[in-house]
Amino acid sequence: MADEQQQTLDPQAPEQTDAPEAAKDLTARVQELEEQLAAAQDQSLRLVADLQNVRRRAEQDVEKAHKFALEKFAGDLLAVVDTLERGLQMSNPDDEAIRPMREGMELTLKMFDDTLRRYQVEAINPEGEPFNPEQHQAMVMEESATAEPGSVLKVFQKGYLISGRLLRPAMVVVSKAPSETPPSIDEQA
């Protein structure tokens, strides 16, 4: 009987000694699972952020595609606007024979201008302003005693911006300081 009691105690003895090891194993397993959970949550947040970035990039790409399509179309329409403006400049406003045609051209030009403005296409007419190489294209340099050197004297063709970005530069005449004339023979004597 003493042996049976000892045998019943013996099986419990190893369990008691294994309890601290089992607790360590469970603690290690809990820590491992917590690390895996944290890694999974981090990965989930990264995937959500990546998805938002992909969505934002796709929206920007669509917006850019619309802008570039509009930019090309607006650029093609500028030749029509230029032609209407030149036609109005060349026609005599006092000529009664062409008055109805001139009024029609003015209305058509106004409609074009209104439509361009609606799509953020703005004209650049820099006459009298300082030359800006980012928005102007110098066609001719001309001496001027009255204008500040480097300013726009005349505009050959208006430039245009679309949504604040250059669509077409203005073609301009830029002033330069008058050159000093060499003294004449009479002045040397």
Curated annotation (Swiss-Prot):
Q: What organism is listed for this UniProt entry? A: Pseudomonas paraeruginosa (strain DSM 24068 / PA7)
Gene (UniProt): grpE
How it assembles, according to the record, is: Homodimer.
Record keywords: Iron included?
no
Question: A GO molecular function for this record?
Answer: adenyl-nucleotide exchange factor activity
Q: InterPro entries given for it? A: GrpE, GrpE_coiled_coil, GrpE_head
Q: What is the lineage of its organism?
A: Bacteria, Pseudomonadati, Pseudomonadota, Gammaproteobacteria, Pseudomonadales
List the Pfam families hit by this protein, alphabetically: GrpE (PF01025)
Gene Ontology annotations for the cellular component aspect, listed alphabetically:
cytosol
According to UniProt, the name of this protein is Protein GrpE
